[in-house]
């Protein structure tokens, strides 16, 4: 089973070297383990993690770990150390060990060795296995015993194991807490050992009583042992315990603030700041106004920049959370807590122009967050302070190429975007500052500033036109060197120009960009700019850039990919000539566009490979082609009202048949077909959306907009022609209320609202079908097509990669060979799966659970046709399982009462953290042959044999009568 399932996984993985199946790979490593040379044994051991990565199913992992346990049992300490490292690296695979008892038994045998180093390695090994053996009493006993050892190495290993078991087992934590307390407080325990024992207390959070006793002990330690190291370790453990147990977080914040204020030691203050930052990130809602005020006072009083920087970083974290609302809320006893007069604002204003960049950045961030979150009208002075602070920081950091300056600049630019979004009336001055500084800044800073300008222009398109002049001037004078920064700057500037040019690029802008790109030998830069042009709907520019790249690629797959992009851009460019009320021209434009789309889809199919099938791209383009054809067909149908109007007796026919639509003539049937076609397209767009689990939100929104376009037209057909009386506009009326994140979405929303208004107006005024109704439909199509299609990121680039590999057992040796099952028994089908990720797992969404659907269908019958209940003829089951460490397994009991060959299909889909179901696949099929059980077969044969003499006797009697 494992070898079959993992072979397909390797075929998909695309490794360059020659691959073996799971059993062969394990046998190769087993040879190394049995070698007499220590070097070969070690090499075999350290290659196991890669084996687990390639074949992540339990049957192989179980065998491999048992072999490693044998090596651990009989090998020397160096081999044991190698096995320990492999176990720690393969932590996520430990729960796939099936024979845990046997595995632990082989490991545990070494604990009785006379060698303290061997015992120490065994203890560390047991600690690494704590997640799968949390309640093993013999392991608990060995750890307690080893804590009393006279060998330092063994004691340190016991401390490591105790920490791991305390995190996993409540019983162990309760039992070890008193012993650790005695050891820490004992005079005979060395100080360095006490420092290693104290962090174990952070895991004593399994219940309130245990957490309380651990807190009391830590409180005693902080008071009784005032040395710097002890205070630092105790306070940090205190913080981690509070963060885990949650109930004592406010007390811990007060304690840390007390040490920050009163303890003169810098190291303790730094630790307090670090822990306050941790609590600010994890539990900002537990911070009271008094806590923030105390931190502000400390920051105002401290003369040390390093400490002030730390405190401001805590405050800047809090200023972006609910804590800032608490701070400025109306307090009993005060009329109001004005932002302008608070210590927090004074501190931020004081730090905005500090000579330390980090302090200035955090000061500006605090001011920005206060300005955006406090929706009061009299904040003009605060807004000006925030803007001036950002401007000074921008000037300071844009002239410096150092990594620190770039990190500070990112903070400032993020604040600018936030300020422009939260306070739109400040956006103009922010943009002017950026454009002014863009000319004199370093290239690295220019790139970041371009990203900032693009983000602001996406949010506030009205500012785009004002940017273009400065941007084009800069593009003309930009350097032409082939350095990475210059290439990146060309792409960033071009992106801002595309965003700022809301509808179409001017001829001058195109000429400037092309002129600069001609001198750039880097084809990758040209491709990236073309990609951005496709994303922003500048298809004429994109077509020319793709055309220029066709001769610069070596691979035929890349050639076909670029050629397909060129054809798609050309196809979309054909639609820019559409004009309202000119329907014959619209038909010719759509026909021309379809011609190039068909060429493009042929190239795109040629560009796909087994490792990169381009499934999303192909489906997206096929849907676009079908949508254009549906639009064309609908325009022809509307035109047919002129060429083939309803006959004079149409009204009489309609009254006779009782179908009011018949008075419209044959156009009614054609419209009904069109409506069904658009609904079918909307359903297919929905399927594409559900299959795109790894797509970014902008791409998904784009697919959603295409789906809404189909639904809009189908609704318009129904409301205008097919069923005007029952048409409802309420469910469609809210489309414009959602916030649009891109110019494409904004324009599409505008078209939707306009079309809905027109349809509703006609629906109320006129009865169908008139030329005004068909003209409204045609104008709606033209309005939708006049918005240039946006090819979003996922069409070009896959930032997140998630796939599921399934293994079924039992499974046949040959995939085409069926599994034999008796018809009076049930088949226990075990389904195992592994979730595989790319380099950025969970970037856009994470898998919460996997939904497994198992169904069976009868392929061919054999034997007699018995009357069997319908319930026994098919199997249809579904289960949801939550992956743990990217692994899941479950079982299904299937019934095959009908003799014959059955086809079992297992299909997986996933559910993300928001509860949305995604049809990711895969779909796996096996065959089962249902055979008659021997006992039933024997009885049937006996009955047949008993019937044969009776039949012969009847036959003889018949002959006698004759």
From Swiss-Prot:
The main location class comes to: nucleus
Entry keyword Lyase: no
Q: Which cellular components does GO assign to this protein? A: chromosome; cytoplasm; INTAC complex; integrator complex; nuclear body; nucleoplasm; nucleus
Q: Which residues form a coiled coil?
A: none
Protein keywords:
Chromosome, Cytoplasm, DNA damage, Nucleus, Phosphoprotein
- Modified positions (Phosphoserine) are 338, 809
SUPFAM superfamilies reported in the protein's UniProt record: ARM repeat (SSF48371)
GO BP field = cellular response to ionizing radiation; DNA damage checkpoint signaling; regulation of transcription elongation by RNA polymerase II; RNA polymerase II transcription initiation surveillance; snRNA 3'-end processing; snRNA processing
Q: Give its localization.
A: Nucleus; Chromosome; Cytoplasm
Give the similarity note: Belongs to the Integrator subunit 7 family.
Write down the PANTHER family for this protein, in alphabetical order. C1ORF73 PROTEIN (PTHR13322), INTEGRATOR COMPLEX SUBUNIT 7 (PTHR13322:SF2)
Summary of the function given for this chain in its UniProt record: Component of the integrator complex, a multiprotein complex that terminates RNA polymerase II (Pol II) transcription in the promoter-proximal region of genes.
Q: Subunit comment for this entry?
A: Component of the Integrator complex, composed of core subunits INTS1, INTS2, INTS3, INTS4, INTS5, INTS6, INTS7, INTS8, INTS9/RC74, INTS10, INTS11/CPSF3L, INTS12, INTS13, INTS14 and INTS15. The core complex associates with protein phosphatase 2A subunits PPP2CA and PPP2R1A, to form the Integrator-PP2A (INTAC) complex. Interacts with NABP2.
- Entry protein name: Integrator complex subunit 7
Q: Which organism is it from?
A: Homo sapiens
Which lineage? Eukaryota, Metazoa, Chordata, Craniata, Vertebrata
